[in-house]
Amino acid sequence: MISENLQKAFNDQITAELWSSNLYLQMAFTLRKEGWDGFAHWMEKQSEEEKEHALAMAHYLIKRGGSAKVSTIDVV
């Protein structure tokens, strides 16, 4: 079983990764609107990568008997 302190640290990082994912996605929307499709595509990929990080940590936490939780994500 994973300790409560470590579980909290993992969950805080999961939330941070998802916040970053949302930030990159918002940047992609803005770039695409301005006609910067190449940069927008790159930001979309960055968003996906951050989400993958969050999922990997959540899967690790659950596999070790912890609970993965996402805290409130502030508006980007």
Label each region the model flagged.
Residues M1-V76:
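Iron-associated oxidoreductase/ferritin-like identity signal
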